[in-house]
């Protein structure tokens, strides 16, 4: 498994994510100083969408941010997170707990909406997708503070 970089160096007809991939990614997240590890699921940098697995552990810090050019869809595969929305002043406006064994398992957030997340359970893995090719966040997409 290649947790960083592209899923495969050649075109593939289909991909299956199994328990071993989730376990390996979780193992890497536990030893990562940021307490999270992403796995890029695109075929190449030219792919027109962003698709990734993100394994995380409690204590990981996700800054309050937004995406100008994309909505964001998150599916919880394992564990639990609290997805938090904020207003322009950094005040929490609402939140939802996504739980792989609970009521809410998927969230679609509109573009330009300030948000963050809190990992509530060890071994958590989410699937994220966004529109367009990957671009690092711009300075005005990360809230100071």
Identify the role of each PLM range.
Residues 66-68, 75-76, 119-122:
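Short glycine/proline-enriched turns and hinge-like loops at secondary-structure junctions
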């Amino acid at each position: 498994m290649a947790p960083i970089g592209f899923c495969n160096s050649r075109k593939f007809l289909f991909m299956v994510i199994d328990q071993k991939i989730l376990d390996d990614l979780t193992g890497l997240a536990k030893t990562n100083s940021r307490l999270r590890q992403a796995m890029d699921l695109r075929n190449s940098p030219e792919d027109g969408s962003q698709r990734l697995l993100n394994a995380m552990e409690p204590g990981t810090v996700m800054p309050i941010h937004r995406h100008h050019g994309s909505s964001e869809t998150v599916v919880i595969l394992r564990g639990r997170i609290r997805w938090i929305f904020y207003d322009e002043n950094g005040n929490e406006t609402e939140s939802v707990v996504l739980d792989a064994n609970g009521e809410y398992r998927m969230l679609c957030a509109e573009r330009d909406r300030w948000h963050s997340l809190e990992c509530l359970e060890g071994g958590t893995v989410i699937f994220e997708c966004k529109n367009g090719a990957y671009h690092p966040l711009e300075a005005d997409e990360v809230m100071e503070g």
